[in-house]
């Protein structure tokens, strides 16, 4: 018997860290792409949240494009390679200019250990972008 007043199903989460260049990322037979696409339907609809910690947005043996395009929330820490930033802008199809995106990145990354959070499915459009966890920006 459930010991709490309100019945809440368990929440499942999978953290994938430091796997660039490994068979998990490089081989389709490893099943990562399939898991990421079908994650909402696992466990009879219970689903699983997948958190991927990577040091490169797109690279050889890195995150598959289909996974990148199905991302719900992207935390973008400082990137020094302009090609990577451009790739994020291209694939994200953000509702803002490249110039504004660069301004937002600079604003967020000027603070130590901070990130630009991009929510690709916000319930409120004004909450699409954040500096860190606490500050909404537009």
What feature does the model see in each segment?
Residues 1-99, 103:
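Conserved P-loop NTPase motor cores
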Residues 104-108:
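Short proline/glycine-enriched turn/loop segments at secondary-structure junctions
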Residues 111-138:
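Conserved P-loop NTPase motor module
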């Amino acid at each position: 018997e459930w010991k709490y007043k309100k019945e809440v199903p368990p929440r499942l989460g999978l953290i994938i860290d430091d796997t660039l260049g490994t068979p998990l990322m490089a081989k389709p037979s490893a099943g990562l792409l399939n898991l990421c696409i079908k994650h909402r339907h696992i466990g009879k609809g219970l689903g699983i949240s997948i958190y991927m910690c990577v040091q490169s947005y797109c690279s050889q043996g890195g995150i598959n494009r289909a996974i990148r395009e199905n991302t719900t929330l992207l935390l973008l820490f400082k990137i020094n390679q302009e090609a990577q930033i451009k790739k994020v802008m291209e694939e994200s199809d953000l509702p803002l200019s490249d110039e504004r995106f660069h301004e937002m990145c600079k604003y967020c990354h000027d603070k130590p250990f901070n990130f630009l959070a991009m929510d690709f499915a916000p319930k409120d459009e004004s909450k699409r972008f954040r500096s860190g966890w606490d500050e909404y920006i537009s």
